[in-house]
């Protein structure tokens, strides 16, 4: 039985004043994504001075990311950052067909997919709801 390989596009904003090692971060999120069995089809880099409260990145770039994701036919748009609930909701309003995850969401998904017992799945689901 052939299972379709899920695919993703990674959005990797680079905040100018951040001390975070950008290239290591992109490499790390790609490894986390591969742990899910998801293949990365592309990385969208964006230099930003400040975090946009609506989409994290600018609205034009958000629309561009969605168009690129549709062109590539990916299953996920994954941010290499933590999105606020408002940013997640706004991004999902722009696109309802492609699943959206941020860095903590990827980690929670890894835990969920690897949970074996009913109790562990419940624990992960509670963590998701709290997040």
Question: Locations of the language-model features?
Answer:
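N-terminal accessory targeting/assembly segments
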Residues: 1-109
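Extended, highly charged alpha-helical segments
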Residues: 104-131
């Amino acid at each position: 039985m052939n299972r379709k390989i899920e695919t993703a596009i990674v959005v990797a904003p680079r905040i100018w004043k951040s001390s975070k090692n950008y290239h290591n971060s992109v490499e790390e999120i790609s490894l986390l994504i591969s742990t899910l069995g998801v293949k990365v089809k592309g990385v969208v880099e964006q230099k930003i001075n400040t975090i946009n409260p609506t989409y994290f990145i600018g609205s034009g770039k958000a629309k561009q990311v969605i168009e690129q994701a549709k062109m590539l036919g990916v299953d996920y748009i994954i941010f290499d950052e933590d999105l606020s609930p408002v940013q997640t909701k706004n991004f999902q309003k722009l696109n309802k067909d492609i699943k959206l995850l941020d860095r903590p969401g990827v980690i929670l998904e890894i835990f969920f997919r690897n949970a074996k017992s009913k109790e562990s799945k419940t624990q992960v689901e509670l963590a998701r709801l709290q997040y």
